[in-house]
Curated annotation (Swiss-Prot):
Any one GO CC term of the record: plasma membrane
Role summary: Joins adenosylcobinamide-GDP and alpha-ribazole to generate adenosylcobalamin (Ado-cobalamin). Also synthesizes adenosylcobalamin 5'-phosphate from adenosylcobinamide-GDP and alpha-ribazole 5'-phosphate.
Topology class, membrane: Multi-pass membrane protein
Subcellular location, principal: membrane
Reaction equations catalysed: alpha-ribazole + adenosylcob(III)inamide-GDP = adenosylcob(III)alamin + GMP + H(+); alpha-ribazole 5'-phosphate + adenosylcob(III)inamide-GDP = adenosylcob(III)alamin 5'-phosphate + GMP + H(+)
Name by which UniProt lists this protein: Adenosylcobinamide-GDP ribazoletransferase
GO molecular function, one term: adenosylcobinamide-GDP ribazoletransferase activity
Taxonomic lineage: Bacteria, Pseudomonadati, Pseudomonadota, Alphaproteobacteria, Hyphomicrobiales
Pathway(s) this gene product operates in, as recorded in its UniProt entry: Cofactor biosynthesis; adenosylcobalamin biosynthesis; adenosylcobalamin from cob(II)yrinate a,c-diamide: step 7/7
Length: 262
């Protein structure tokens, strides 16, 4: 029972860290604020966070609403629940990578709360690609299948965050990610394994063809590996912003692959 209680505490802490969803205080009693073990619950937390978007897809699909309108509301629901946390990370990362002459200037730019040209373009592309991809493939699935596919994507993109976080050292010692601690090796393995398994099961239940599932997993791997390598070269490590950007980029990659393959 203790293990089960600890796991659900980790789920609750992960939901609180990754979203604006209020979580009861009891899950944080005696907790030091570290997420080294809690990251094992990121994929499941991602599914819970994506439930409002999935319900939106099911309900609007059931009444045959416009696919473009449905896609916009799905992405809006996701951003509302997370407080656009991951989008903020993507924008800051784009500004830092695009405008920084070196590691120090990139990190300084990423700390600036103001959005620049690179960040604005990154957000436009992220929202645009996700909306257009959803509008392309959701009409080809049942309403329930579309909602379940969103949950699968959420599990994968949160697993990607853990992999990126675990593979790189902190780029700065005073950042949010550094304060949360490094993911523990067993927790990282659980996050990756559960993320992949949950996504596979959910994609199967959604009715997505096997070829499309394989292509989406290929896009997932390519996105997280490529971006982690770029972050290592640019910053020599990760930040909270690059972890958030990892979620966005892998979600874009998976949804784009599904739109191409279904």
């Amino acid at each position: 029972m203790t293990e089960i209680r600890e796991f659900w505490d980790d789920v609750a802490r992960s939901v609180a860290f990754l979203s604006r969803i209020p979580v009861p205080d009891r899950h944080f009693r005696g907790h030091d604020g570290g997420l080294g073990r809690a990251v094992r619950a990121f994929p499941l937390a991602g599914i819970l966070i994506a439930l409002p978007a999935a319900v939106t897809a099911v309900l609007l699909g059931a009444i045959h609403a416009s696919s473009l309108f449905t896609a916009f509301l799905i992405v809006a629901a996701q951003a509302t629940v997370t407080g656009a946390l991951h989008e903020d990370g993507l924008a800051d990362t784009a500004d830092g990578f695009g405008g920084g002459r070196d590691r120090e200037s990139a990190l300084e730019i990423m700390k600036d709360s103001r959005i620049g040209t690179y960040g604005a373009v990154a957000l436009i592309l992220s929202f645009g690609i996700r909306v257009s991809a959803l509008a392309a493939f959701l009409p080809l699935l049942t309403p329930t299948g579309g909602g379940v596919a969103l949950l699968a994507t959420a599990a994968l993109s949160r697993a990607a965050m853990v992999w990126h976080w675990s593979r790189l050292p902190p780029a700065r010692r005073d950042g949010v990610a550094a304060a949360a601690g490094a993911p523990e090796a067993p927790a990282t393995s659980v996050a990756l394994g559960s993320g992949v398994i949950l996504a596979l099961v959910l994609f199967f239940l959604s009715g997505i063809p096997t070829v499309a599932v394989l292509l989406s997993f290929g896009a997932f791997v390519l996105a997280v590996l490529s971006f982690t390598r770029i972050a290592s070269r640019k910053l020599g490590g990760h930040t909270g912003d690059t972890i958030g950007a990892t979620q966005q980029l892998t979600e874009v990659a998976v949804l784009g692959a599904l739109a191409l393959a279904i």
